Each structure stands twice: as structure tokens, then as C-alpha cells.
Amino acid sequence: MIDRYKHQQLRIGLVSPQQISAWATKIIPNGEIVGEVTKPYTFHYKTNKPEKDGLFCERIFGPIKSGICACGNYRVIGDEKDDPKFCEQCGVEFVDSRIRRYQMGYIKLTCPVTHVWYLKRLPSYIANLLDKPLKELEGLVYCDFSFARPITKKPTFLRLRGSFEYEIQSWKYSIPLFFTTQGFDIFRNREISTGASAIREQLADLDLRIIIENSLVEWKQLGEEGPTGNEWEDRKIVRRKDFLVRRMELAKHFIRTNIEPEWMVLCLLPVLPPELRPIIQIEGGKLMSSDINELYRRVIYRNNTLTDLLTTSRSTPGELVMCQEKLVQEAVDTLLDNGIRGQPMRDGHNKVYKSFSDVIEGKEGRFRETLLGKRVDYSGRSVIVVGPSLSLHRCGLPREIAIELFQTFVIRGLIRQHLASNIGVAKSQIREKKPIVWEILQEVMQGHPVLLNRAPTLHRLGIQSFQPILVEGRTICLHPLVCKGFNADFDGDQMAVHVPLSLEAQAEARLLMFSHMNLLSPAIGDPISVPTQDMLIGLYVLTSGTRRGICANRYNPCNRKNYQNERIYETNYKYTKEPFFCNSYDAIGAYRQKRINLDSPLWLRWQLDQRVIASKEVPIEVHYESFGNYHEIYAHYLIVRSVKKETFCIYIRTTVGHISFYRELEEAVQGFSQACSYDT
């Protein structure tokens, strides 16, 4: 469909019977209205032509061959002569055969049937709106019991038994047998209601605004009562409140979209265009048919049988009529969603029929495989690897992929700069991989974002835009912080690259889809760009160090490789003196010169506020110098004091990994603060 803003879109929802009839019916030039499928036949076994009023009827769905009717007559399509535009003998219009891809038909159901998606799927929308248990509604739909109608004070059959609603289980066999078909219809239409028609009546009587008001009042009352002290009762109250919220949201959605609740019960069943459920002839003259055709045939057979029972037969028991209505309901359920009520229906080879739900849902369904998963131009695909040196909003594209994606832009750049006279010369330069080609490619990529998508796209962060840069190799480089949004890791995952072409798409990619603009989860608001995968391992290795404290490391034989300034005593103990550094640059320089390791403990001079130091903490050791100065050694810091107990300096006990991690955090915070100050 196309909305008022000329956006092509697809929407799945409920439609009225009038809308279904408008889609499926058409008036041929002689004034006859066609569109209803009344026969369960497909092709005639002798002539191999579609049966009239059948599932492949050319009067309803259009000719099989363009401009040729069922009789074999031919007319030129679009001819402005006064010849009739349809065959007066067979009633087939002379139109293009492509009409069979979108022209629908319909089946007029003798009895209403509920749409199984809205009854059996969780949550059950019909049960939520009616505020009744799902099992009770199922028993009503499949004619297991009935409801009593509120009628006038006239004498009724049900008054003989009082409350019919609670005694129907013992009466469900006696009542249909008591009446003939004609009498049973009078009785049922006047005093009881059963089947999908009962659901339709109850849905039609609903006032959605009153439902919202009553649900809100009940929700407030439950909230004011507070906990009862009984855990089971409290859970029931919480579940009831959640149900009321869902019911109000559902009623608001029906009001907002102008959908009537009774549309969840079908009176007209749409028939798909025949090209979407084809019958194909294979080798040996055998025919292969779509499973949907067989399911449609079953619906038509049972619907016609019910019509015959109600119109031709006068002595059929009412129970048989109710049984046939149940069969029609089950046939429509199987057509829409096979197996939703239990065991799926199978063919003669014990193969499960593919229903309408099976055709459209899942990885191999119509949407994901044909509409979303099909190959498109200006797209590529490759394995992703980590790019730790990339910025958050950048991705690395291999040269092979980039030159294919941006080939048209590179050709235009070569021609504009008079480096190529025509498209053929430009393509030859690209094939030869001349240096000027890569320069123009980099210029093009600087102003053109790309979209990265990882299947399955379960939320909007499954597609994000990045600024591409050229990298060597044949893999796509990705910043590890964006992995959580894609639910990706680097164990062989693949991602697709798409190039937005229109200005609107590029603007949307820059303003809404850039990775650095999607730092929070749109669902719950939690940070989505958090360290994962290799970043967590790297941070752990960087900041691990030793966990056993200063006492355990005084004479630790495991630290033999940590230091160059080591002293060995005759007592077989190894004393490892921890080095002192005045600043972080000296410590990192010593690490680069391989004088210390990444996790080697060291003392770093630091400007530490003494108010942070606990006054009750007692030093582990005190070292005195010859001039009276002394060192107070604590678990994580060291204080150098004079004879007069004045503090000269403070050292903290850390590692090179901690120093590097702190410097990275400090630079990031300073850069963020500067960016915020520029914005303000």
C-alpha cells in the first residue's frame, strides 16, 4: 500500500468484510459481478483448463495467457477498437495475464468462523477483550456448549431448566436431537448462541471506551488494596493488574486504528491469487500443487456440505449441523495455521500441509526470504573481525568490497577529473587497480556512510551506519563496542554492507543510524555500547596484576622473572625489591625496555589526598634511613616522612597495566568534557 506521503509500506491487520469483498469482486463489461469461488475444482482432467468458478477460474482471476480467453479467442491488449473487452461466451476479459498475481477471490462462508490467530495465539486477543477464559471460548467456538440469549419475557424452552448456561454440558446432546434442522434453527436463533456466531455477537456488543474505563477503575481499586499477606493472592492480584493493562492497551489500539472487534470473526474468506499458489506440470505429465490449494478445497467442500444441509435437507438433526459447522471452523484453522490446535493435518504421504502461516513466517517464509533476504544491488557480505584501532563510528571495508560498492561513484570521479574519457576507460583503470583509483575511492568514501546489517535483525540496532575506511584483507573490521547491538562476536559471523543511495537515506543514516548515536538500548534505556568479548579479556589481563597483597609478595619465589634488581640470600629466599617511579612515563618506559612486566608491582609517586587515608590504619612496615627520614609502608600506598613527621611524598602501589588503563580513561573523560563544553 502507499500512504499519503507516498511511502510504500506493508501492513498486516484486520479488515472488514466489505473491504474483502471490494478486493475480490469485480464487474465484467456485461455487468456481471464475479469473485466468489464456489467450486473446489482446479483444472479439468481432459482439457487441462481451469474449471469455471473454481480455484483457478479465468473469469475471477484473469486469463492464463495475455489477451486469450478460455475459448481460445485473441484480442490485442490496449486496442482502442470498439470490439468488446471480454469474451461473451466464457466471460473472460482480454487483459494481461499478470493480473493473476494480484487479483483475489473470496469464499462466502455459510457460518461465521473465528480467525485462529486472534483466538489461539498468545496472547489471545478475543479472550482479552471478552475477559473470559480461553478454554471456555474454545468450547463455544467448536460447538462443545452454548450460551443462552437474553430475550424477552415470552415463554421459552430454556425456562424449563432454569439457568441454561451452567447445565449445557448435560444438554448438548439432547437439545440438537430434540429438534429437526428447521426447528433447531428457530430455537437456536431465538434462545441459544453457539459457534463463532456467538463470539461475533459478543464482540459486536462491546463498547471499547467503556472497557477502558472499567479496566482503569478496577486497576486502581486493586492498587489501593495493597498486599494481603498471602503470597498466592498477591500473585493473582499482580496477574490481574497486568491483564487489565494489556486489555486497555488492546482496546486503545482498536480505537486508534479504527478496527472493529467483530472483524476477528470471518464471514468472507479471501482466496489468494492463483500465481501465489501455483500448479506446475513436471516431467512425466505429473502435476505439483501448492498445499494451500488442497486446504482451500477442503474448506470449500465442507462449506458446500453445510450449505446443502441448511438449504436442501429438512430432516437432518441439529447435532449434525453443529458438527458440520465445527468441521468448517477446523478447515479454516488448518488453512490459516496448520497444527495450532494439536496434531497438524497430513497428506497421503504423511507430509504436513504448509498452511498460510508456514508460507509467510520463519526464515524460509515470504518476508524473510523473499522480501527481506533477497539480494540487492550496492550490497556486499563478508566475515567480521575486531578492529580495536577504529573509532566507534567507523568500520573497515576491504578494498575488494569497497571498489565494487562504490564503483559507479569512482567512475563518475574519474570522468569528472578528466582522468578517463568514458565509462569503458574508467572500468579498465579500475580493473588495473591504478593508484589514482584508490585516491578517488577514499575521497568518495569520506562523504558516504554505509549500513551494516547482521541477521537476524530482531531490533532496530541490528542495522547501524558507519563511516567506512579502507583496510587490507578480505574481512570487515568492526569496533568491539558495537557488538552487543548486533549480537555479534568474532567467531566467524558474517555481516552485510549496504550503500544508501538517495539523499534521504544518507541523511537518515547520518542523523539516526550512526553507531555513536545509538549508545542506549531503545527498549529499556540501558547502555548498549559496553565492553564485551575480547575487550573484557583485555581489560582483565591489563588490570589483573597480583591479588595477594604486599605481604605475600615480599618473598615470593614466583616473581623470579619480574625484576632485574633482585638479591639472592643463602637462606634460599628470594627478595624482590619493588621499583619506585616518579611518574607514569618512567614506568611505561621501563616496561617498554622490558625491565618490568605488565603485571609487576611498583611504587608510583602520586598526589593523594591524605583525607582519603584511613586514620586508624596501621603501617605494615616502617623503614628508617640514616638521616632520620622513614617510610611507612601500607597495603596499597607508601608515605615518606621526615624526622618531624612531615609528609614529603606519597607513593601508591600499582602496575603498568593499571597505569595504562587509567591514562586511557583520563583521556576519554577529558575528550568527552571538551566535547560537552564545545556543544554548550
From Swiss-Prot:
Q: Which stretches are transmembrane?
A: none
Which organism does this record belong to?
Answer: Nasturtium officinale
User: What job does this protein perform?
Assistant: DNA-dependent RNA polymerase catalyzes the transcription of DNA into RNA using the four ribonucleoside triphosphates as substrates.
List of residues binding Mg(2+)? 489, 491, 493
- Give the protein's cofactors: Mg(2+); Zn(2+)
Question: Could you confirm whether the keyword Endoplasmic reticulum appears in this record?
Answer: no
Classification via InterPro entries: DNA-dir_RpoC_beta_prime, RNA_pol_asu, RNA_pol_N, RNA_pol_Rpb1_1, RNA_pol_Rpb1_3_sf, RNA_pol_Rpb1_clamp_domain, RNApol_RpoC1
Keywords of the record, alphabetical order, are: Chloroplast, DNA-directed RNA polymerase, Magnesium, Metal-binding, Nucleotidyltransferase, Plastid, Transcription, Transferase, Zinc
The UniProt catalytic activity note for this protein reads:
RNA(n) + a ribonucleoside 5'-triphosphate = RNA(n+1) + diphosphate
Any single Gene Ontology cellular-component annotation: chloroplast
Q: How is the cofactor bound?
A: Binds 1 Mg(2+) ion per subunit.
Q: Name one GO biological process term.
A: DNA-templated transcription
Q: Subunit info?
A: In plastids the minimal PEP RNA polymerase catalytic core is composed of four subunits: alpha, beta, beta', and beta''. When a (nuclear-encoded) sigma factor is associated with the core the holoenzyme is formed, which can initiate transcription.
Record GO terms (molecular function): DNA binding; DNA-directed RNA polymerase activity; magnesium ion binding; zinc ion binding
Subcellular location, record wording: Plastid, Chloroplast
Instruction: Give the record's family classification.
Output: Belongs to the RNA polymerase beta' chain family. RpoC1 subfamily.
- State what protein this is by name: DNA-directed RNA polymerase subunit beta'
Query: What SUPFAM superfamilies would the database entry show?
Result: beta and beta-prime subunits of DNA dependent RNA-polymerase
Any idea which positions bind Zn(2+)? Answer: 69, 71, 87, 90
